[in-house]
Curated annotation (Swiss-Prot):
InterPro entries: UPF0574
Region (Disordered): 28-95
Family: Belongs to the CYSRT1 family.
Entry's Gene Ontology cellular component terms: cornified envelope
Gene that this sequence comes from: Cysrt1
Coiled coil: none
Protein name: Cysteine-rich tail protein 1
Length: 142
């Protein structure tokens, strides 16, 4: 065996990091859990604390849309779609109308098991989406 191969296979074998040094609050949480009588009472508390925040944010985000003016309501989703297009391919956001992308549920058809918004598996040079992802017209025909 080549000694360089062994180094490449396990480059972190010589590194040892104690858990207490990673997060000081983690050590405190681990000490509290065994001292409590049941761990099931301790675990739902963080989940219950975390769940209301996103629900409140979603309700706050969704509430102005239906109550707002139709012109404002129509422009907000289009702006969100344009923001989504620019990270995938900044060159195509101005060339294609926003109607070619879908919002909400993905379309039903071939390739639905593929991640729809993946930008790292190009199927063509214009949109950089997976094959048959149906995000853009060029993906549908390829």
């Amino acid at each position: 065996m080549d000694p360089h191969e062994m180094v490449v296979k396990n480059p972190y074998a010589h590194i040892s990091i104690p858990r207490a040094h990673l997060r000081s609050d983690l050590g405190q949480q681990l000490e509290e859990v065994p001292s409590s009588s049941s761990s099931s009472e301790t675990q739902p508390l963080p989940a219950g604390t975390c769940i209301p925040e996103p629900v409140g944010l979603l309700q706050t985000t969704e509430a102005p849309g239906p109550k707002g003016i139709k012109g404002i309501k129509g422009t907000a989703p289009e702006h969100g779609q344009q923001t989504w297009q620019s990270p995938c391919n900044p060159y195509s956001s101005g060339q294609r109308p926003s109607g070619l992308t879908y919002a909400g549920l993905p379309p039903v058809g071939r390739g639905d098991d593929i991640a729809h918004h993946c930008c790292c598996c190009p199927c063509c040079s214009c949109c950089h989406c997976p094959r048959f992802c149906r995000c853009h017209s060029c993906c549908v025909i390829s």
